[in-house]
Amino acid sequence: MAARLCCQLDPARDVLLLRPFGSQSSGPPFPRPSAGSAASPASSLSASDESDLPLGRLPACFASASGPCCLVVTCAELRTMDSTVNFVSWHANRQLGMPSKDLWTPYIRDQLLTKWEEGSIDPRLSIFVLGGCRHKCMRLP
């Protein structure tokens, strides 16, 4: 069973806070990567670098045609942190009027992460609960 992390962006200090979900109330901040610190797309996660995974790196299954692993992309609303939901299902429900079913991938890449970094994301999802998988990481363009 993969550990779940509570990831929260602190715009005042420009850091991403990673905390164990449900076991600890605080954790050490990890700086977001600079543009020049891109990691190799084929690098796999080891136990040592799992704790400081940069915001810009996501598992390769995140952008697969069949969608990401359920444990990787789960989220919870601030008021109901105990009940996580699958992000793909949540996003599909919000995008019912979109003409194509596969538009969630570019939306996540281009808009969601940008909104999160700018602090203008939907306040109900300002904290994400992410689980881990062992897929290789990729660098977002």
From Swiss-Prot:
The keyword Transcription regulation belongs to this UniProt entry's keyword annotation: yes
PTM remark: A fraction may be phosphorylated in insect cells and HepG2 cells, a human hepatoblastoma cell line. Phosphorylated in vitro by host protein kinase C or mitogen-activated protein kinase. N-acetylated in insect cells.
Positions with biased composition (Low complexity): 24-48
Main localisation: host cell
Location(s), subcellular: Host cytoplasm; Host nucleus; Host mitochondrion
This protein's UniProt keywords: Activation of host NF-kappa-B by virus, Activator, Apoptosis, Host cytoplasm, Host G2/M cell cycle arrest by virus, Host mitochondrion, Host nucleus, Host-virus interaction, Modulation of host cell cycle by virus, Transcription, Transcription regulation
Positions of transmembrane segments: none
GO CC, one annotated term: host cell mitochondrion
InterPro entries assigned to the protein according to its UniProt record, in alphabetical order: Transactivation_prot_X (IPR000236)
GO biological process: DNA-templated transcription; symbiont-mediated activation of host NF-kappaB cascade; symbiont-mediated arrest of host cell cycle during G2/M transition; viral genome replication
A Pfam match: X
Source species, domain of life: Viruses
Region (Mitochondrial targeting sequence): 68-113
Free-text function comment from the UniProt entry: Multifunctional protein that plays a role in silencing host antiviral defenses and promoting viral transcription. Does not seem to be essential for HBV infection. May be directly involved in development of cirrhosis and liver cancer (hepatocellular carcinoma). Most of cytosolic activities involve modulation of cytosolic calcium. The effect on apoptosis is controversial depending on the cell types in which the studies have been conducted. May induce apoptosis by localizing in mitochondria and causing loss of mitochondrial membrane potential.
HAMAP family linked to this entry: HBV_X (MF_04074)
Complex formation: May form homodimer. May interact with host CEBPA, CFLAR, CREB1, DDB1, E4F1, HBXIP, HSPD1/HSP60, NFKBIA, POLR2E and SMAD4. Interacts with host SMC5-SMC6 complex and induces its degradation. Interacts with host TRPC4AP; leading to prevent ubiquitination of TRPC4AP. Interacts with host PLSCR1; this interaction promotes ubiquitination and degradation of HBx and impairs HBx-mediated cell proliferation.
Family of the protein in this entry: Belongs to the orthohepadnavirus protein X family.
Entry protein name: Protein X
Native source species: Woodchuck hepatitis B virus (isolate 1) (WHV)
Organism classification: Viruses, Riboviria, Pararnavirae, Artverviricota, Revtraviricetes
Gene, per the UniProt record: X
